[in-house]
C-alpha cells in the first residue's frame, strides 16, 4: 500500500496521510481549512515498514476506512506538574 504524506502549513507537527498523491477528495473541507496548504513530504510504501510516531496498522486502517489519516503532535509536557511530582516524591522519601 502506497501513501503520500503532507505536513500542515498552519499546525506544526501535524501530518496528513492519503492513499493517492494530491487526492484530497476524502478529506473533509473543515479539516483541510484547519490544516492549511498541504506541503508534500514523501510518498512511501507502508507494507513491511515502521513509522516513528504512529502505529502503522492504525494508519492503514484509517486510510482504508476513512480515506486519510491525520497525525497530530503529542500534547506538550507540563513541566510544572512534573516538577511538583518530583518534589512530592523527594519529600516522601525523607
From Swiss-Prot:
Q: Which PANTHER family match?
A: PROTEIN YCGL
Q: Which InterPro entries match?
A: YcgL-like_sf (IPR038068), YcgL_dom (IPR027354)
UniProt-recorded name of the protein: YcgL domain-containing protein VP0875
Q: What's one Pfam family the UniProt record gives for this protein?
A: YcgL
User: What are the residue boundaries of the YcgL domain, all occurrences included?
Assistant: 1-84
Amino acid at each position: 500500500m502506497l501513501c503520500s504524506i503532507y505536513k500542515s502549513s498552519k499546525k506544526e507537527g501535524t501530518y496528513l496521510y492519503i492513499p493517492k498523491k494530491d487526492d484530497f477528495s476524502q478529506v473533509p473541507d473543515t479539516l483541510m481549512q484547519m490544516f492549511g496548504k498541504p506541503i508534500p513530504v514523501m510518498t512511501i510504501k507502508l507494507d513491511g515498514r515502521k513509522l516513528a510516531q504512529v502505529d502503522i496498522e492504525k494508519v492503514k486502517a484509517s486510510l482504508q476506512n476513512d480515506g486519510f489519516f491525520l497525525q497530530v503532535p503529542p500534547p506538550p509536557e507540563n513541566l510544572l506538574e512534573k516538577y511538583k511530582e518530583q518534589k512530592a516524591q523527594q519529600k516522601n522519601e525523607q
